[in-house]
């Protein structure tokens, strides 16, 4: 039997870090939303009791470093499954981009194996499993738009943001999330208005949503990687209504209210950046084709 799941990327409309916790994690408040840039995760049942992961993309790990592998092993062990599964990931989301590609692949494995092995687990139960392997996995199980708190595993769903386009550009650099958090001075940063962002979304107020964009990690990454700042500036110059870095970077996204401006921004960025995408925000997982 074979199951196919889509694994959409996410962007952070608001990302705040409150403090470092005794367990070593950071206490965060994030407004996240899924976009229609998605990997495809194909699950094929194996009679042999093993988990394999493969991809056409050589940068995708095929062992326990891959969150998709961890998700499958966790479900096998937790529910005593003696069968195996082959996982093939068709990567569309850029790797190590601040778009939760690995977390979304893992979430897709949880959803897919729930069907493949007929476990009848609820989405909330799958999200709780997700929290055991990664902070973003819980959100990715559900998708849509949500406020994430704690270390990112506590999810409260909110309204879908007002209608707009999202243009993304990823420079050809890697960013160490651990290093970004290490450099972050929580007591000295200006914290974004997370509640204001939620209000803007619920009011379907595009301009207010643009005004409330914020990411406390952005200034750290911009200092470490000036090319990210260059992409931000160019995206604004080409006409994006608002621009922000997603997660710890290096991907930058621009919100664009009118479709007529999207192609110009896309073409302008493609002049110097290979990985550029024009997409939409989506609601729950079932809104994906």
Swiss-Prot record:
Reactions catalysed according to its record: 4-CDP-2-C-methyl-D-erythritol + ATP = 4-CDP-2-C-methyl-D-erythritol 2-phosphate + ADP + H(+)
Pfam families named in the record: GHMP_kinases_C, GHMP_kinases_N
GO BP, sorted A to Z: isopentenyl diphosphate biosynthetic process, methylerythritol 4-phosphate pathway; terpenoid biosynthetic process
Residues given in the record as ATP binding sites: 94-104
Keyword tRNA-binding: no
EC number from the UniProt entry: 2.7.1.148
Tagged with keyword Kinase: yes
Enzyme active site: 10, 136
UniProt-recorded Gene Ontology molecular function terms: 4-(cytidine 5'-diphospho)-2-C-methyl-D-erythritol kinase activity; ATP binding
Keyword annotations from UniProtKB, A to Z: ATP-binding, Isoprene biosynthesis, Kinase, Nucleotide-binding, Transferase
This protein's pathway: Isoprenoid biosynthesis; isopentenyl diphosphate biosynthesis via DXP pathway; isopentenyl diphosphate from 1-deoxy-D-xylulose 5-phosphate: step 3/6
Family stated for the protein in its record: Belongs to the GHMP kinase family. IspE subfamily.
Main function: Catalyzes the phosphorylation of the position 2 hydroxy group of 4-diphosphocytidyl-2C-methyl-D-erythritol.
Stored PANTHER family: 4-DIPHOSPHOCYTIDYL-2-C-METHYL-D-ERYTHRITOL KINASE, CHLOROPLASTIC
Identification of the protein by name: 4-diphosphocytidyl-2-C-methyl-D-erythritol kinase
Organism of this sequence: Bacillus licheniformis (strain ATCC 14580 / DSM 13 / JCM 2505 / CCUG 7422 / NBRC 12200 / NCIMB 9375 / NCTC 10341 / NRRL NRS-1264 / Gibson 46)
